[in-house]
Amino acid sequence: MTDFIPTTDLSDAQPQAQVAAPVLRDFGGRTRFQGAAVTLRISENNPLVRQTLQTPGAGRVLVVDGGGSLNCALLGGNLGVFGVENGWEGVIIHGCVRDTAELRELDLGIRALAAHPRRSGKLEEGERDVPVTFAGVTIRPGDHVVADEDGWLVLGAESP
């Protein structure tokens, strides 16, 4: 893993970095995380999140475009445990999470819009490894995502 460089330093040194709007909250036990993006586009159904977190993360970050839905949670404690067990660095969700007390105890970076007690649907639909856009940034599979106490940003796949 590359040494961690804070988002403030990256933003100053790399003006091409896409800095995300500060609309996501921190829910994970790890505040600082980084890695290559794996992307999903889903709508109020989380089987693709489960399937992805059950595969080796190899230090990557799962980026989920849930359409900004505030109707249900796309990640909870059980799926968070899969992320830790399989070596994921973090999960960024344009949607909601639940089981927030459990998520806070996990060694996993987690950003999401809000907490919601309702679970998602279980239809296996959505897209994987597609560009996703939310919070004012576009994330492509393989882009380098960096998150810390000051926010999160996206660098091209060739960046550290």
Swiss-Prot record:
Any GO MF annotation of the entry: oxaloacetate decarboxylase activity
Reaction(s) this enzyme catalyzes, per UniProt: 4-hydroxy-4-methyl-2-oxoglutarate = 2 pyruvate; oxaloacetate + H(+) = pyruvate + CO2
InterPro entries: RraA, RraA/RraA-like, RraA/RraA-like_sf
Domain of life: Bacteria
Cofactor binding note: Divalent metal cation.
Biological processes annotated in GO: regulation of RNA metabolic process
Essential cofactor(s): a divalent metal cation
Enzyme Commission designation: 4.1.3.17, 4.1.1.112
Keyword field: Lyase, Metal-binding
Residues reported in the UniProt entry to bind substrate: 76-79, 98
Amino acids binding a divalent metal cation: 99
Family that this chain belongs to: Belongs to the class II aldolase/RraA-like family.
Functional description taken from the UniProt entry: Catalyzes the aldol cleavage of 4-hydroxy-4-methyl-2-oxoglutarate (HMG) into 2 molecules of pyruvate. Also contains a secondary oxaloacetate (OAA) decarboxylase activity due to the common pyruvate enolate transition state formed following C-C bond cleavage in the retro-aldol and decarboxylation reactions.
Subunit structure: Homotrimer.
The name this protein goes by in its record: Putative 4-hydroxy-4-methyl-2-oxoglutarate aldolase
Organism expressing this protein natively: Deinococcus radiodurans (strain ATCC 13939 / DSM 20539 / JCM 16871 / CCUG 27074 / LMG 4051 / NBRC 15346 / NCIMB 9279 / VKM B-1422 / R1)
